[in-house]
Amino acid sequence: MLFRSADGHDISSIASVASFFLSRIDSKVDDMLDQLAEADGGKRDQIVQVKGKVAIANAKIAYQEYKKITQSDRWQTLVAKGAKVQRLLWASTSTKNPAYSDVMYVDELIGPDTVNTLPPNTIEACADHCDVSSRIETEVDQAYAVIDTLPVVGINLDEVMDELLAEGIDKFIKPFDKLMDSLVTKVKQLSPA
């Protein structure tokens, strides 16, 4: 938006989200934590304390960073020119571990300027037992403590995120390529010979 605005273009119609795929984080980190707990019983208590909490902790910290950005002078300059706030989108919100609440990625992350994509089973669970109150800014200190524990037990979250990013891109590239191939085929079929 900075570049568009600097070039004199209207930025008031731009809408966007920054997506966070939540359950993938916990699935990957939890597997690593399980392996570490087996290998190093001395850190078992610390490992158990963070299991199933990394995705939400990371999202809550991201929200704090998001607020800093949207409250900055740089962003406020764009708002004065009509910019809409980019919202945080929570995706992959169905829990993969049956030991966890089926609405944990919803209940804990409700807040201003956020969007949550819900699969049908999570929608049904929310209709039944969600706590619809703004909690994105609760227990932020605990979120930092969860993330700070990871290197202590032997997990580099940056490396985990890089792996998840690569896996996620791959998961989107293959279907996109397949879609493009089918469109090319359809165009050829519909084109006069």
Predicted region positions:
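Short, small-residue-biased leader/transition segments that mark boundaries at the very start
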Residues: 1-2
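Flexible, glycine/charged-enriched surface loops at secondary-structure junctions
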Residues: 7-12, 73-83, 157-162, 189-193
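Glycine-rich phosphate/ribose-binding loops and adjacent secondary-structure elements
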Residues: 20-25
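Active-site loops and adjacent core secondary-structure elements that bind or stabilize anionic groups
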Residues: 28-111, 130-131, 159
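A polyampholytic, Gly/Pro-enriched intrinsically disordered region
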Residues: 5-11, 37-44, 138
